[in-house]
Amino acid sequence: MRKRIGNDKPIIGPYGVNKGGSGDMYNKGNNIIHYLKQIFKNDDAFYACLRAMNKEFYHQTITSADIEQFISEKSGINLSKFFDQYLRTKDIPVLLVKKSKKGFRYKWTECIENYEAPVKMLVNNHAVWISPTTSWKSLRQKEKLADLSMDQNCYAEIKIIE
């Protein structure tokens, strides 16, 4: 499905000018929602959020901001930068990773200012959640770093520098 995403323009077009967003909105939106599900780290909590959102906003006219705030509250994570990145820009963030013998440094690039979003990494075949920002952070390992990749369920790109 990601191969069909052109990232030609933001999902949310400009308001008040009768101009729609990207034709990618369904495929890209699907990937964004799936990534959000991963961020919840618990399928039951994610589905409970969707049910609560349906109940809360039943038969109302709402805005994207209403949904974004609701999901942030239910997840316990400030996702404002996440939504700004994925809904209001066409770009997919890139996790820049610099490997060392016993760990790695990482930060988000090709993203909005002060972007932050958790991401699940596979480090020596073990799942590890990290919370990158646009500033460098580090993760040290006790054993030698043999294998490193991003979980494919996270909708982002990764660039590893040896």
Regions picked out by a protein language model, each given a short descriptive name:
Residues 154-162:
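Edge beta-strands of extracellular beta-sandwich domains
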Residues 12-15, 22-100, 104:
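Amphipathic alpha-helical substructures
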Residues 5, 58-61, 129:
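Compositionally biased, intrinsically disordered low-complexity regions
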Residues 1-10:
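Post-HExxH zinc-binding segment in Zn-dependent metallohydrolases
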Residues 45, 79-80, 99-153:
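Beta-strand-rich binding/interaction modules
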